[in-house]
Structure formats: structure tokens, C-alpha cells
Amino acid sequence: MESGGGSLGLHTSDARMAHTMIMQDFVAGMAGTAHIDGDHIVVSVPEAVLVSDVVTDDGITLDHGLAAEVVHGPDIITETDVVTEGVIVPEAVLEADVAIEEDLEEDDGDHILTSELITETVRVPEQVFVADLVSGPDGHLEHVVQDCVSGVDSPTMVSEEVLVTNSDTETVIQAGGGVPGSTVTIKTEEDDDDDVKSTSEDYLMISLDDVGEKLEHMGNTPLKIASDGSQEDVKEDAFGSEVIKVYIFKAEAEDDVEIGGTEIVTESEYSSGHSVAGVLDQSRMQREKMVYMAVKDSSQEQDDIRDERRVSRRYEECQAPGNTFDSALENRNTTAAQYLQICDSMNTNKVLKQKIKKRRRGETRQWQTAVIIGPDGQPLTVYPCHICTKKFKSRGFLKRHMKNHPDHLMRKKYQCTDCDFTTNKKVSFHNHLESHKLINKVDKTHEFTEYTRRYREASPLSSNKLILRDKEPKMHKCKYCDYETAEQGLLNRHLLAVHSKSFPHVCVECGKGFRHPSELKKHMRTHTGEKPYQCQYCAFRCADQSNLKTHIKSKHGSNLPYKCEHCPQAFGDERELQRHLDLFQGHKTHQCPHCDHKSTNSSDLKRHIISVHTKDFPHKCEVCDKGFHRPSELKKHSDIHKGRKIHQCRHCDFKTSDPFILSGHILSVHTKDQSLKCKRCKRGFRQQNELKKHMKTHTGRKIYQCEYCEYSTTDASGFKRHVISIHTKDYPHRCEFCKKGFRRPSEKKQHIMRHHKETLM
């Protein structure tokens, strides 16, 4: 392009037909004027319709119709110098080699002007088109040409069609790059009454259109958007995710809009001219969806009210409900770039206060929450991270997110004031305090003499305090040393860890140790409830023989002052003697039919008959057919067949479901009191029959020989079981692997699972 002498010449390359157009002659033919303003040529012509075709030697063809034809030519980047309002031009566009400005002053007329300039050999760097805003007074029209710049050298020109309405400003955006044209008109209207001012403030208006453009309102006048409904609502971005059109508006003073309310214009209404006109008349341009949102942090409510006048607006990006975060880009919404507008006006504060008052009284306030009014008008509660201010829709997501802050997780809730011990468990903290008491037993009184002692608990969003009162807890003392603790479980572990060597016979239930097996056997009765010792004078029963002697001596001794006339019993109290006489003289109305035993009620008599005189065991085991007197005994026995071996020997890998069997195992295998030794293998035994049975293994003779097969053994009980289970008809269910017989199929199945499980697998 060359400029000089007040003329503008357009020249083609040497390989093409030369086309020359004198601008002054062209303008004069249109009854217009042209002048030079600095580096630009300003052309003014009456408002008309101009269509540019391919220029030949015949000249220029004019058509006063309203249609625009497309002429192929290189893309031109256009820059507009704005007179009335400021225009933001991206820096990338300023690097273009060519910029053309046209200032068209209109006369009175209703036509539309479309101008095109044809050029050749114009090479500009590939850039992105820019949208400029041009405004002017009434009766004056200014036009902006926008094209998508590319590096194509072929002569291509895209003509544009501009629709003019009775508005002050307008901008036309033509999508390039092969995308079907979608015209979005941004229209601003001023109020008729200048005295009436909107009480709402201006907020950033974000629109995600088909090509991802961002339009920003620069003035103080509210914006209305009318979008072409022919385009798809959902597109895909560079990451393959869906991009949704989102428009966020501020509410105007005359709009009766509720926070969280939405307004949707259907496609049918959009295609109807009356519906669109009605929306325009009501100062509401059509849009697919308008969302009024507000976010409020309850902890910042008072600060927002105090800073309300100097803080006009604030924006935060938040995840929409139902969307997920990418693992690498946690703060990015892969579905759409949605923004929430935070309104700090007094009206919004009132709405948020009403929402907060409806909160349940019993709800904990340990977690900070933010109230979000969603698109459906319902309040949504999110949980913000107090470290990075991210928000989550549940406490579980917040806890999972807190793992990204390892420095915070390293902090412990409880810290000892006497040392550097820290922990997150309250029980461990108390146990640690007790360790200080054991170490500094001299200072035991000083440990709890203070009225209160406070330990700070640092929670993620609040601070609580743990108060220890001066009341001493109940202490459990070890009978073998000076150890004491407030928990029985700690004492049991202490006995196992410290005193297990001195007291090898340890109870599997409570961990208490004993020196002799008889002591352990006597102690086990306290857990099972067995009372084998019964008083011969009364119904008293006990688990220890010494307790029975004490009872007889104290209740039935010969030196007691009150003696019974009917029996040799004596009592130390007259009331006890009278109670005995009442029972003896006829209050025991339930007489046992088998003996002289009498009971005061039928249940006691039934228990006596079952336990003493009945050889029948009504409660039978379904697996081994063993009978029991009571259902509780049967239930305890059934655990053996269920395979729940919860009792394990602490000396070896032996496990059993019966604590008595475990005690017998410990006594027979792991006790040091094994005085009977085998002379050949030096193995010890507690009883003579066990040693005698063991000695048979060294003779080499199988004294028990089966007469039906080649089976032989030194164990009489084993030989008896062999004959009954293998060679009798009482066991019809035979094992397929060892030919052992069983009475029931369940016994056979249990045998196979126990002895032939590897064969099955």
C-alpha cells in the first residue's frame, strides 16, 4: 500500500492483471469527500449500499440492494481509532504490517454501508482478530471492519453485513477460520430518566461463545446480550471436554430477580419475533440462561459488612456441582469455566443471614462453610480449605484434600507440657501422662494438685481445650511390683511383658500370671463361673475350697452361739438361724423325687434334677452328637466345630476355641513342673500315665493289632476309634480318601475339610 499526493493506489503483483483505483475519483463519483489525517485517509460518503466485486478494467459495479456478495481476497487486519470511547487493542495485533481505518460520516438516510478494499501482496503475521467498540452521536454512523488474519496469499475477501438499529453503539463480530458465521450483537441502552440510577454495581460479564471469545463491559451501563440460537449450546475445548455457554449478569434495580433465580428463554420463543420483541421492550435481551449467584463465608460475614463500602466486587472460581477435578489440574473445571459472582451488598447479606438462621441448632460448627445459591435456587453448602481457600462439597473431599498439606498433618492435637511428646489420640495422651506419674512418683501429689491444667488441641478449623480436673482416676496396681495405671488393659499387658517369666502360667482371658498350674486352674473358674465346691449344710457353692472352709467355719461352726435343733448347723446371727428354720420347716415346698433335696421354686428344683439325677442330655450337638444339660453349654461347645480358634498359646502356634483346652495345653506342654522324665529321650511329663503311654513308643512293638486290617497302634483309645469308625456299620458315611466312617454327612464333610483339604485343592 502506498500513500502520497492525496491518493491511494492498490497494485497487484506482476503475475496478475494490474488493477488500479484512484480513491479520489472513486469518492467523487459517490458524491463524497476524502482528506488525509496524518497517516490515514478519511473518506466520507452519504449512507448507501456498496457492494465490491472483482475489479477489472471496466471499473466498479455498484448495487443498491441489501445483499452482500463474497469476493475472494487475502484477509486484512483492521484497527479502528476510537473517538468517543476507548478501545482495547491486543498487543499481538499492533505488530501487523497494515492497518486501515475508515471514518464514515453519515447523512440522513436509512441505508446500510458495507465497504470493501481489495489488495494484493499484503503479508501480515498470523494473528487473532480483535473486536473494537465505536460510538458516536445520534445521526452519525461509524463502521468497524473485522477480519481473521491468516498467512494465506491467495486473494480472498470476506464481506460483512452490518445490521443497524436505533442504538448508540454496536459491535459486529464475524467468526473466521471456516466457522459458520454467528453474529452476536451487544446492545446498550441508556435510561430515559437520567435521575434514576441503578443501586446495583457493575460486575464482570463473562460469555463463552462458540469460538471461546471473552467480551468485557467497559462502561457503567448494564449490558444485555442477544445470542444467535442456531449455534450449538455445547462445544468441545482443546482438552476434549464440553464447553458450556455461561452468562453471569448483575441484577438491575427494576428487575425483580431473586438470588439464585434463573430465567430461560426457549428456542421456540427465540424464533418467534413477538417473543423477542417483548423481551427487548422489557429491557431484557434474550439469553439462554441468566444466573444470579452469591457466595458468602460465614466467618467473614462481619468483615464483609464492615468493608462493604470500599470493596465493590469480588470474584472467585468454584467447582460446579456434579463436576470433577482433574488429578493434575485440581483447580480447573474440566466441564466449563464457570464463575460465581460474590455480591457484598446489604441485600445479599440479609438473604444470607436468613439462610444461616435456618441452620439446625445441634449442627457442629467445627468446619467453616460457605453458602452458595445454586442455579436451581437452592442453597449449597461447601467446605473451604483454610490453607488454600479451595472449596469442596463434602467433608470427605476436604479431608482427602488436606493430605496435600503434609505440614499441617504433621501437627499433633495433644502435646505434653512436661516433654516433647505429641499425639493425635486422647487415650495415648492420658497414658503418657500416667508414665510421668510412674517415673516421678515422688511428685505424684503435685501432679494433680492444680485446679485445672489446659492442653491446647489444634484442630483444622478451630481450637478446643482439654481440661484435666484435680480428681484422681481409679488406679489399678500390680501385685508383683509398684506399677499402677488407670486402665485395666494396660495392667494386663504389663503382666504379660514383665512378669510372664516369673509367673509362666498366664490366664488367656485377663493376662494374670501364676506360679503353679493349680493356681491358674482355680483362677480360670472365675471366668467360666464354675463352682464345684458346695456346702453340705446349705446351698452355698464356691469355686475355691478355701472359701468353702471359710464359709463353713463362719456359718456352720460348732462354736457359733445359734445352733439348729434339726441339724448340726450353727449360725452367728439369730436372724440367720430363723431364716434357716423357716426354710427347713416347710418353706421349701418343691421336693426332689430322687433325694431329700428341697427348693423354694420350681426352677431351682429343675436345675437340681438335671445336674444331679439326670443322665439324659437334651441339648445335643449336631456335629458330634454330644449332649449337654443347658443351651449355654451347647453353644460354647459349638464354637469348637465352627473353627473359630480365638485362643492362641503364647509359647507356640497352638490355637483353640476352648480356653480350658488351652490351659490344659499350657499345663501339659509348657509348664516347668514336669518331674517325670523319660529315660531315653529326657522328655518330661506331669502324670505317670502320660509317661507310661510315652514309654510304649520306644519299645517298637505295636501291641494293638486290628483283626480286620493291618492297622496297629500302641494307643488303646486310638485303636478303639479305628475299629468303631472303620469296621462297624454304625458309621455308614465313609471318607473317599481314608475310608473312615461317620454317622452323619456333616461329620464326613468336616473330616475332609480338616484332613484332606490339600487333596481337594
UniProtKB/Swiss-Prot annotation:
PROSITE patterns from the UniProt entry: ZINC_FINGER_C2H2_1, ZINC_FINGER_C2H2_2
Stretches annotated zinc finger (C2H2-type): 383-408, 414-436, 476-499, 505-527, 533-556, 562-584, 590-613, 619-641, 647-670, 676-698, 704-727, 733-755
InterPro entries in UniProt: C2H2-ZF_domain, Transcrp_activ_Zfx/Zfy-dom, Znf_C2H2_sf, Znf_C2H2_type
Keywords: DNA-binding, Isopeptide bond, Metal-binding, Nucleus, Repeat, Transcription, Transcription regulation, Ubl conjugation, Zinc, Zinc-finger
SUPFAM superfamilies given in the database record: beta-beta-alpha zinc fingers
A Pfam short name: zf-C2H2
Alphabetized PANTHER family for the sequence: C2H2-TYPE DOMAIN-CONTAINING PROTEIN-RELATED, FINGER PUTATIVE TRANSCRIPTION FACTOR FAMILY-RELATED
Subunit structure as annotated in this protein's UniProt entry: Interacts with PHF8.
Protein name, per record: Zinc finger protein 711
Organism, scientific name: Mus musculus
Gene: Znf711
